[in-house]
């Protein structure tokens, strides 16, 4: 009887020491069903699944929802005195991307890498060339920590605002009625700085969201603005079977109730043959008015919502967790107490890299899942335009060939100008496949600030959290090795390093036996005491002590086993 690979791989004795990588190709799910891993996470250790609502459970349709927000913000600006001509602008989804930085001094939209190096710079609709950029940023670099000047437009809600800033700067720079200045524009004796304009836009956006008609118009036509996924009840019900599920949203109860009712307004329950269930039944805890990111710090008073009126009941809620109660405010500490969970027991799923992901990880140690809707298009370009990526690799090979037989004694200077021009052209074509500002994650070979934040703070990420449906709850999401250039560009072949070729070859940490006392005495110039230290040398670990992956650590399992043994005694 033959044994399948699946059976053999579950028996430590049958595991092969090594294998030809072509003999057993690693299984990967379809790209659009994948969950991508920055830090290893064992799903069986997760006891609570937490969700944000806006752009997570409720995905707003693009560009319809951004267009609505854009139009309402423009109307608000015109109502406070901005020119009527602005009403002619229409939201263009091909221009903005998330993660751009607005320079409130010069009015520029800037795409930067993790260190503040400028990748793309646009003044209005004008994409600035290198010389133009260097006139305002001599080193093509910005100080990102200067938050008074530089504002990061990181969220999906920022997309209409990003495009509106470009529209305004372009309008006031090119309209004949206004005189353009380096830091703003003039209308006769009136001067408006880009900083003041930016603050007006920020105030208008806040007004539209909190006092205006954005939510009202969204609710009036939910099919137009909100994506409904029939798989949502199924995933939440499966999560209910293995742990607790909670909702934490900054939205108020009335809006939350209308959105969630629409999402679960299906003719069936979790399965096609099951009866319909109200949305509240899928959650062990529902919390509105969270005021994230404040929620992950000191928080606010925990109140109870009267679900009949939507108003808050007086007094602070001090009771235990009760199914069906809707809470308002509170903090992540209070939530953990109600759920009986600690930091790493919780997987929190959200779209806001600062309000949801960064703060929940840094302040509470929650495991994090970032929803990135743009990832669907990024993957499409990555696969559909593979010929462009392959051409860039070929150009790298051509470049290496030109320098192949040259060293520091060579006077020959190969003409690489044609290859450089081609690299720039292919890179530009590749960037334009994503949109005018290029990819959300990179510009050419360099990763963006947004990409670095995703890698730093999100344990998992995907285009949609629904992709968790395609993984068992016992799954180990194991992070791939992050290779440095000396690892990714050097093949796994034995290389002999001779001391004559490289004096650095003597810096070998494993070949010499430093435990030889004679070797040590030979190098000592001071006298040796007859009284010896308890340990002359460190001992090589005989067991696995180095924590390579966050969820590879077996200490927690050992502690749980010890606790179970104590309880049995």
From Swiss-Prot:
<dbReference type="GO" id="GO:0106411">
    <property type="term" value="F:XMP 5'-nucleosidase activity"/>
</dbReference>
<feature type="binding site">
    <location>
        <position position="202"/>
    </location>
    <ligand>
        <name>IMP</name>
    </ligand>
</feature>
<keyword id="KW-0546">Nucleotide metabolism</keyword>
<keyword id="KW-0479">Metal-binding</keyword>
<keyword id="KW-0808">Transferase</keyword>
<keyword id="KW-0378">Hydrolase</keyword>
<dbReference type="GO" id="GO:0050484">
    <property type="term" value="F:GMP 5'-nucleotidase activity"/>
</dbReference>
<feature type="binding site">
    <location>
        <position position="52"/>
    </location>
    <ligand>
        <name>IMP</name>
    </ligand>
</feature>
<dbReference type="GO" id="GO:0005829">
    <property type="term" value="C:cytosol"/>
</dbReference>
<feature type="active site" description="Proton donor">
    <location>
        <position position="54"/>
    </location>
</feature>
<feature type="binding site">
    <location>
        <position position="54"/>
    </location>
    <ligand>
        <name>Mg(2+)</name>
    </ligand>
</feature>
<dbReference type="GO" id="GO:0046037">
    <property type="term" value="P:GMP metabolic process"/>
</dbReference>
<dbReference type="GO" id="GO:0046054">
    <property type="term" value="P:dGMP metabolic process"/>
</dbReference>
<feature type="compositionally biased region" description="Acidic residues">
    <location>
        <begin position="550"/>
        <end position="569"/>
    </location>
</feature>
<dbReference type="Pfam" id="PF05761">
    <property type="entry name" value="5_nucleotid"/>
</dbReference>
<dbReference type="InterPro" id="IPR036412">
    <property type="entry name" value="HAD-like_sf"/>
</dbReference>
<keyword id="KW-0021">Allosteric enzyme</keyword>
<protein>
    <recommendedName>
        <fullName>Cytosolic purine 5'-nucleotidase</fullName>
        <ecNumber>3.1.3.5</ecNumber>
        <ecNumber>3.1.3.99</ecNumber>
        <ecNumber>2.7.1.77</ecNumber>
    </recommendedName>
</protein>
<keyword id="KW-0067">ATP-binding</keyword>
<keyword id="KW-0547">Nucleotide-binding</keyword>
<dbReference type="GO" id="GO:0042802">
    <property type="term" value="F:identical protein binding"/>
</dbReference>
<feature type="binding site">
    <location>
        <position position="249"/>
    </location>
    <ligand>
        <name>IMP</name>
    </ligand>
</feature>
<dbReference type="InterPro" id="IPR008380">
    <property type="entry name" value="HAD-SF_hydro_IG_5-nucl"/>
</dbReference>
<keyword id="KW-0963">Cytoplasm</keyword>
<dbReference type="InterPro" id="IPR023214">
    <property type="entry name" value="HAD_sf"/>
</dbReference>
<comment type="similarity">
    <text>Belongs to the 5'(3')-deoxyribonucleotidase family.</text>
</comment>
<comment type="function">
    <text>Broad specificity cytosolic 5'-nucleotidase that catalyzes the dephosphorylation of 6-hydroxypurine nucleoside 5'-monophosphates. In addition, possesses a phosphotransferase activity by which it can transfer a phosphate from a donor nucleoside monophosphate to an acceptor nucleoside, preferably inosine, deoxyinosine and guanosine. Has the highest activities for IMP and GMP followed by dIMP, dGMP and XMP. Could also catalyze the transfer of phosphates from pyrimidine monophosphates but with lower efficiency.</text>
</comment>
<feature type="binding site">
    <location>
        <position position="215"/>
    </location>
    <ligand>
        <name>IMP</name>
    </ligand>
</feature>
<feature type="binding site">
    <location>
        <position position="251"/>
    </location>
    <ligand>
        <name>IMP</name>
    </ligand>
</feature>
<feature type="binding site">
    <location>
        <position position="250"/>
    </location>
    <ligand>
        <name>IMP</name>
    </ligand>
</feature>
<feature type="binding site">
    <location>
        <position position="206"/>
    </location>
    <ligand>
        <name>IMP</name>
    </ligand>
</feature>
<dbReference type="GO" id="GO:0008253">
    <property type="term" value="F:5'-nucleotidase activity"/>
</dbReference>
<feature type="binding site">
    <location>
        <position position="351"/>
    </location>
    <ligand>
        <name>Mg(2+)</name>
    </ligand>
</feature>
<feature type="binding site">
    <location>
        <position position="456"/>
    </location>
    <ligand>
        <name>ATP</name>
    </ligand>
</feature>
<dbReference type="GO" id="GO:0046040">
    <property type="term" value="P:IMP metabolic process"/>
</dbReference>
<feature type="binding site">
    <location>
        <position position="453"/>
    </location>
    <ligand>
        <name>ATP</name>
    </ligand>
</feature>
<dbReference type="GO" id="GO:0046872">
    <property type="term" value="F:metal ion binding"/>
</dbReference>
<feature type="binding site">
    <location>
        <position position="54"/>
    </location>
    <ligand>
        <name>IMP</name>
    </ligand>
</feature>
<feature type="binding site">
    <location>
        <position position="52"/>
    </location>
    <ligand>
        <name>Mg(2+)</name>
    </ligand>
</feature>
<feature type="region of interest" description="Required for tetramer assembly">
    <location>
        <begin position="548"/>
        <end position="569"/>
    </location>
</feature>
<dbReference type="GO" id="GO:0050483">
    <property type="term" value="F:IMP 5'-nucleotidase activity"/>
</dbReference>
<feature type="binding site">
    <location>
        <position position="144"/>
    </location>
    <ligand>
        <name>ATP</name>
    </ligand>
</feature>
């Amino acid at each position: 009887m033959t044994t399948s690979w699946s059976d053999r791989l579950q028996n430590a004795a049958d595991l092969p020491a090594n294998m030809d990588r072509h003999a057993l190709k690693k299984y990967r799910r379809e790209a659009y069903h994948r969950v991508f891993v920055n830090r290893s996470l064992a799903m069986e250790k997760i006891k609570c699944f937490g969700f944000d609502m806006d752009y997570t459970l409720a995905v707003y349709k693009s560009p319809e929802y951004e267009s609505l927000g854009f139009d309402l913000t423009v109307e608000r600006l015109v109502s406070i005195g901005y020119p009527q001509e602005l009403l002619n602008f229409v939201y263009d989804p091909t221009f903005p991307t998330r993660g751009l930085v607005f320079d409130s001094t010069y009015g520029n939209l800037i795409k930067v890498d993790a260190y503040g190096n400028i990748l793309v710079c646009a003044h209005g609709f004008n994409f600035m060339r290198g010389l133009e950029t260097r006139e305002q940023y001599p080193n093509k670099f910005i100080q990102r920590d200067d938050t008074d000047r530089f504002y990061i437009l990181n969220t999906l809600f920022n997309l209409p605002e990003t495009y509106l800033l470009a529209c305004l700067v372009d309008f006031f720079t090119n309209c004949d009625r206004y005189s353009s200045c380096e830091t703003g524009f003039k209308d006769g004796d009136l001067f408006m700085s880009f900083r003041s304009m930016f603050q007006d836009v920020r105030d208008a956006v806040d007004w539209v969201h909190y006092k205006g008609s954005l939510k009202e118009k969204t609710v009036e036509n939910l099919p137009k603005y909100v994506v409904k996924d029939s798989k949502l009840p199924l995933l939440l019900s499966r999560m209910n079977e293995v742990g607790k599920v909670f909702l934490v949203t900054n939205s108020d109860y009335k809006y939350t109730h209308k959105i969630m009712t629409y999402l679960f307004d299906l003719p069936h329950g979790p399965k096609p043959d099951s009866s319909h269930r109200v949305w509240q039944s899928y959650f062990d805890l529902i919390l509105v008015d969270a005021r994230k990111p404040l929620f992950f710090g000191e928080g606010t008073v925990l109140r109870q919502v009267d679900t009949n009126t939507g108003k808050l009941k007086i007094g602070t809620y001090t009771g235990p967790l009760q199914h069906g109660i809707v809470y308002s405010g509170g903090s992540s500490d209070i939530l953990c107490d109600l759920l009986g969970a600690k930091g790493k027991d919780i997987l929190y799923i959200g779209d806001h890299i600062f309000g949801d992901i960064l703060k929940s990880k840094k302040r509470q140690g929650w495991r994090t899942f970032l929803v990135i809707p743009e990832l669907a298009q990024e993957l499409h370009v990555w696969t559909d335009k593979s010929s462009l990526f392959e051409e860039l690799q070929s150009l790298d090979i051509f470049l290496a060939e030109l320098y192949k037989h040259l060293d520091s004694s060579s006077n020959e200077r190969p003409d690489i100008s044609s290859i450089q021009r081609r690299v720039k052209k292919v890179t530009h074509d590749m960037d334009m496949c994503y949109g005018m500002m290029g990819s959300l994650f990179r510009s050419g070979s360099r990763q963006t600030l947004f990409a670095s934040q995703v890698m730093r703070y999100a344990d998992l990420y995907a285009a949609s959290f629904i992709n968790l449906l395609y993984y068992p709850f016992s799954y180990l999401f194991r992070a791939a090795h992050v290779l440095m250039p000396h690892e990714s560009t050097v093949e796994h072949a034995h290389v002999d390093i001779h001391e004559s070729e490289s004096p650095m070859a003597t810096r070998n940490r494993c070949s010499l036996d430093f435990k030889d006392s004679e070797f040590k005495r030979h190098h000592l110039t001071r006298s040796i005491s007859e009284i010896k230290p308890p340990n002359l040398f460190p001992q090589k670990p005989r067991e696995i002590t180095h924590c390579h992956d966050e969820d590879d650590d077996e200490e927690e399992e050992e502690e749980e086993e010890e606790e179970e043994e104590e309880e049995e005694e």
